[in-house]
Structures are given as C-alpha cells and as structure tokens.
C-alpha cells in the first residue's frame, strides 16, 4: 500500500456535488452534554471549509461518537456537536436524526449552496461496525444483507466521498470502506498523515531515528521488526527498556516492569539490528520510586548500582537524557512513539520534557519530527508544542498499525491519484 499516491480532495471537482465526508467527531462530552474538548472538530474544519468554498451543493458529515454498540442511545448523540460546529464555521448546520434512510436522503437532496448537514451517530446501527452487543455483552454479528443495505444507504447521500477520519483508518467499518462512489478522496487531515508517514517509511532523510517507549517489548515487536530495516538508530526507552537491560546486561531492575515473553525476543532484535547496522541506544541511569505515585520516595540508580529491591524505575536519569539528546541532534528524520517515563506524575516527567525539548530543537533546525499518536501525542499537547513539531499524528491505533507495516483498510479504500 503506497501512502503517497492517494487521491487528495484538492484534485476533485466538488462544484454542484453532494460531498459526503467521514469525519472524526468522537469528542468528549460532560454530564450536561457539552463538548469539553473541540480539538477533533477543529481538525476537520479545513476539509469542510474547502468543500463549501469550492461550490459543493451539500456537505454531509458522518461520524461515530463513543461505543453505543449498534443501538440508539441518546447519551451518544452527535447533536451536541451542532452548536460548536456552527460557531466554528460561522454558518448554520442541519442535524439529521439518522445517518441513513428516506428522510435523511430527502434532507440531503434538498440542500443547496454548501449547506452543512451532520448525520446522527453511525454506530447507532450495528451495520457500521459489523456487530452489536446483546444484553449480556456478547458480540452479535450483523447480517451481511443488512450491512450491504446500510452501505448503499450511506452511498446514496453523496456524489463524492472524502475520508478525513485517520483515527479510524485501521477499522474496516462501513463508513470507512463501504461507500461505493467513483471518487474517494483523502481530506486534509488524512492527506497530511499520509504525507508525513510516507516521508518516514518510504523516503526518509537520513540519519533516521526511531524513539520507542512503552511498557512491553511484546507489544512493540511488530513495530520494531518493521522499523529495523528502515532506521539508522533506535532509542529504546520507557518500561520496556528494563526488559532489554536485564536480559542483555543483567542489570538489577528491582521491581521495575519485566516482560517475560518479550525477554525471549530481545536477542533476536539485537541480532537483527546488527544485520541492518542499526545502533540501539538504551538508558544507563534511572529515577526510581518505592511506589507508583507522585508522593513516592524518589531515588536514583545507574547500571552499575542497579535498582534495589522494593524500588522501580519510573523515568530515565540525566546521563540517559544526554545520550538521547546527542542521538536526536544527529538525526534528520525522527519518529517518536512512547515517552521515556511516567510523565503524568511530576517527579517522573523530566526525561520526557527533555526529550520533547530536543525534538522541538531538531524540528526548528530543519529535521522532520513525527510523533506517532497515543501517549506521545498527549505529551505534545500537555506541553503545548504541537505547532513546533513537524507532525503530531491524530490516530493512536491507526498510526501504530501503519508503523507496524499493516495495510489500513480506510486508506486502501481510497482512490489512487
């Protein structure tokens, strides 16, 4: 699956067309149904505005919100998004009480002059995800004929399909892969994701560094496997570094995370790194704690001293940070997935802050820095540096699967240029 040859929305004539856009409006709501963080709505604005400005007859937005499990549940209605979207767009938005059916088709077909229509939650229908849950919480597969009918129902609402929901691109859901229109284009968000991941995975400026954190080696094995033939260096940090240190160098790790299953593959990873001439950088010192808490007794340890029993490593220490800074400064492409420490707790956030500073410096001096979703994206948001990094991915699971070398159904379904 080539990432760089997908049809962008800018190559499609939208004049007079009904433009059906899959957005990601899966936003958090408080108990009064107010949107508490509109970031995902803001993210979709460039694509929505582009369709309006380029003469679309109707701009039809479809999304999921939460996990209603294939049944109508007012708690997960997309209606609270309407006032937020109206304010951001500066124009009225029509809400359709269902995402398919004759009434919805009538609303869409009557629209003119770029009228924006937001459809109700796709996941109120079991046919979106392909299954629902019964009263006992067991999965019930949706009937194939019903799924086909639902997909036809969505297809009937547009002349052109645009996907701007990268966060759901790894799911083969009906709204991602089942809309059967001649032109299926990438919106601006998806286009940016694909461009940056193509830069890293298909034609990186070298040296190419990957920084991988996370708890378990076994969770990241596919990722490491797919990246080793592509990168020049690899920083292994976070909880999974302890499995490497104990297995390779017999460092005493106290009560730190140890991944028994992962430890069996550490040797293979090191051999493969040698084969591809990849330098693996591991931490050499640690910030320790007697419990997983902000008010823990904090200590320091090195490889030589080891971490004493009763203590665990929750961050890497200043010497490790220096190693990371040097490696980051030498790289031209940096892909970062997983923080070095438990940044949510203040005493164990300093290596994450220092790594982030180094990444920002690298981006400012012209390197391409990509943050791959999930916890690391949370870090970038927490320290308000998203605009200082070349690209912060919006899709945790989707970016991880892409980096693991998997094909994303939502991307594969798009037309080629």
Swiss-Prot record:
UniProt pathway annotation: Carbohydrate degradation; glycolysis; pyruvate from D-glyceraldehyde 3-phosphate: step 2/5
Compartments where located: Cytoplasm; Mitochondrion
Keywords of the record: ATP-binding, Cytoplasm, Glycolysis, Kinase, Magnesium, Metal-binding, Mitochondrion, Nucleotide-binding, Transferase
Biological processes per GO annotation: gluconeogenesis; glycolytic process
InterPro entries from the UniProt entry: Phosphoglycerate_kinase (IPR001576), Phosphoglycerate_kinase_CS (IPR015911), Phosphoglycerate_kinase_N (IPR015824), Phosphoglycerate_kinase_sf (IPR036043)
GO MF term list: ADP binding; ATP binding; metal ion binding; phosphoglycerate kinase activity
Annotated binding of ATP, by residue: 215, 220, 239, 313, 344, 375-376
Sequence positions that bind CDP: 214, 219, 238, 338, 343
Catalytic activity annotation: (2R)-3-phosphoglycerate + ATP = (2R)-3-phospho-glyceroyl phosphate + ADP
Any Pfam family hit: PGK
Span of the signal peptide: none
Coiled coil: none
Required co-factors: Mg(2+)
UniProt xrefs under Gene3D superfamilies: Phosphoglycerate kinase, N-terminal domain
Residues given in the record as AMP binding sites: 215-216, 220, 239, 313, 344
Main location class: cytoplasm
Enzyme Commission number, as recorded: 2.7.2.3
Binding, (2R)-3-phosphoglycerate: 23-26, 39-40, 63-64, 66-67, 122-123, 170-171
Record-listed ADP binding positions: 214, 238, 343
Described purpose of this protein according to its UniProt entry: Catalyzes one of the two ATP producing reactions in the glycolytic pathway via the reversible conversion of 1,3-diphosphoglycerate to 3-phosphoglycerate. Both L- and D- forms of purine and pyrimidine nucleotides can be used as substrates, but the activity is much lower on pyrimidines. Negatively regulates the biosynthesis of acetyl-CoA from pyruvate in the mitochondrion.
Family listed: Belongs to the phosphoglycerate kinase family.
Subunit structure: Monomer.
Protein name in the entry: Phosphoglycerate kinase
Lineage, top ranks: Eukaryota, Fungi, Dikarya, Ascomycota, Pezizomycotina
């Amino acid at each position: 699956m080539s990432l760089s040859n997908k049809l962008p929305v800018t190559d499609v004539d939208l004049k007079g067309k009904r433009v059906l856009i899959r957005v990601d409006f899966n936003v958090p709501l408080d108990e009064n149904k107010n949107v508490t963080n509109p970031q995902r709505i803001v993210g979709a604005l460039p694509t929505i505005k582009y369709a309006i400005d380029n003469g679309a007859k109707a701009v039809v937005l479809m999304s999921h919100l939460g996990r209603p499990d294939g049944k109508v549940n007012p708690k997960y209605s997309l209606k609270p998004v309407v006032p937020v979207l109206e304010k951001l767009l500066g124009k009225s938005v029509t809400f359709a009480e269902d995402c398919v059916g004759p009434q919805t088709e009538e609303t869409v077909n009557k629209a003119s002059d770029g009228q924006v229509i937001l459809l109700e939650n796709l996941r109120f229908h079991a046919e979106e995800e392909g299954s629902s849950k019964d009263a006992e919480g067991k999965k019930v597969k949706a009937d194939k004929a019903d799924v086909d009918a639902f997909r036809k129902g969505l297809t009937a609402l547009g002349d052109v399909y645009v996907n701007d929901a990268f966060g759901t691109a790894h799911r083969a859901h009906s709204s991602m892969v089942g809309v059967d229109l001649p032109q299926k284009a990438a919106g601006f968000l998806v286009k940016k994701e694909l461009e940056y991941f193509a830069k890293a995975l298909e034609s990186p400026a070298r040296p190419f560094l990957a920084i991988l954190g996370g708890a378990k080696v076994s969770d990241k094995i596919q990722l490491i496997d797919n990246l080793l033939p592509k990168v020049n260096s690899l920083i292994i940090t976070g909880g999974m570094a302890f499995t490497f240190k104990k297995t390779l160098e017999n460092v005493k790790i106290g009560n730190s995370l140890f991944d028994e299953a992962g430890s069996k593959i550490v040797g293979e990873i090191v051999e493969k790194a040698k084969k591809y001439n990849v330098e693996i950088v591991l931490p050499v010192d640690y910030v320790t704690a007697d419990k997983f808490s902000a008010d823990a007794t904090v200590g320091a340890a090195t490889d030589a001293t080891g971490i004493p029993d009763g203590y665990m490593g929750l961050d890497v220490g200043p010497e490790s940070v220096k190693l990371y800074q040097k490696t980051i400064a030498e790289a031209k492409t940096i892909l970062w997935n997983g923080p070095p420490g438990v940044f949510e707790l203040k005493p164990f956030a300093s290596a994450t802050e220092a790594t982030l500073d180094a990444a920002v410096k690298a981006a400012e001096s012209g390197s391409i820095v990509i943050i791959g979703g999930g916890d690391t994206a949370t870090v970038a948001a927490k320290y308000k540096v998203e605009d200082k990094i070349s690209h912060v991915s919006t899709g945790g699971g989707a970016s991880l699967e892409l980096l693991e070398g998997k094909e994303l159904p939502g991307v594969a379904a798009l037309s080629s240029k």
